[in-house]
Amino acid sequence: MDMHARISQLFQASIETKQQAMEVILPHIVQASELMVQALLNEGKILSCGNGGSAGDAQHFSSELLNRFERERPSLPAIALTTDSSTLTSIANDYSYNEVFSKQIRALGQPGDVLLAISTSGNSANVIQAIQAAHDREMQVVALTGRDGGGMAALLLPEDIEIRIPAKVTARIQEVHLLVIHCLCDLIDNQLFGSEE
């Protein structure tokens, strides 16, 4: 195997996936950022969840809001539901792994908050239950998905927003998810604190 050629192929595949996605998801990213900004202006917060790499994305997003993205600014209220190992394991042990996020949302979520739900397949059972719990708490949902949107897409209400990456390879979907997260952080900062350009 020519490793240089393989790396070049992977870069090219990532670039092509991002270009294809950009044509489809731009308006949804704008809408999601506006929804999140409105929640923050109304003293709400953003909860986030996902599994595996998507759990890392949920944590990445919340840390960019809680700390900072690319400028000095006040901290913004965001909680990744993927970080408390005691809570996650106790819920999984006493109830079900499918409830590890939904039980937290029922405790922490308030009307007007936003849930950022991340799954490359759209079929993660615990993320699907998180969306159901968010709706029960009168929260709106931003769903980051891929492929055909899976069960998550079927659950979304008209006021929710799906950002679906038109790709099938998990790694390519994850790469675009990270870019979307950075776009959201940038747009949130610019809407709340003004453009730096």
UniProtKB/Swiss-Prot annotation:
Pathway: Carbohydrate biosynthesis; D-glycero-D-manno-heptose 7-phosphate biosynthesis; D-glycero-alpha-D-manno-heptose 7-phosphate and D-glycero-beta-D-manno-heptose 7-phosphate from sedoheptulose 7-phosphate: step 1/1. It catalyses: 2 D-sedoheptulose 7-phosphate = D-glycero-alpha-D-manno-heptose 7-phosphate + D-glycero-beta-D-manno-heptose 7-phosphate. The keyword Zinc applies. It holds the Pfam family SIS_2. Disulfide bonds: none annotated. Its EC number is 5.3.1.28. GO terms for biological process: carbohydrate metabolic process; D-glycero-D-manno-heptose 7-phosphate biosynthetic process. It is an enzyme of class 5 (isomerase). Substrate binds at residues 51-53, 64, 93-94, 119-121, 124, 174. Catalyzes the isomerization of sedoheptulose 7-phosphate in D-glycero-D-manno-heptose 7-phosphate. HAMAP family: GmhA. Belongs to the SIS family. GmhA subfamily. This is Phosphoheptose isomerase.
